[in-house]
Amino acid sequence: LHLLHNIDNEELAALYHGATALVYPSLHASFGTPIVEAMSVGTPVIAAKGSSHEEAGGSHTIYITPNDSNELAEKIDLVLNNEELRQNMIKRGKQYVTRFRAEVCAYNILNCYKRIGIDITDDRYF
């Protein structure tokens, strides 16, 4: 376990990529950005149930009951020792998180406006 502070984006991506798994048991996170960041570079994720983590990680993350250290240890052991599971989490996780890329989100927002009849490329909106 390493507690790091003031990590730049490039170093953070390298740390995620070099990790065997991201363990994210937080219950008080907002969206779960670390989950998406880890999955985007191919790092399997174990996260707590009951927050926005399920949206961030989808079905390609292993979820644990909050404050259950035995379950957490069991799931860490599972990810460390089941290569087929790890590779599946890596492959499907990378595919899943593409939905959170900036250009995909921007495209979806533009389409929402179009569906309600607003062309935000019109100069009136700037």
Residue locations for each model-derived region?
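Nucleotide-activated donor-binding/catalytic signature segment of Leloir-type glycosyltransferases, i.e.
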Residues: 1-10
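Conserved acidic donor-binding segment of nucleotide-sugar-dependent glycosyltransferases
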Residues: 6, 62-69, 78-83
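Acidic donor-binding loop of glycosyltransferase active sites
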Residues: 14-33, 43-44
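Short glycine-rich donor-binding/catalytic loop of glycosyltransferases
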Residues: 27, 43-57, 66-69
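A short, well-ordered alpha-helix in the C-terminal region of glycosyltransferases
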Residues: 71, 85-99, 111, 115
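C-terminal alpha-helical cap of glycosyltransferases
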Residues: 102-126
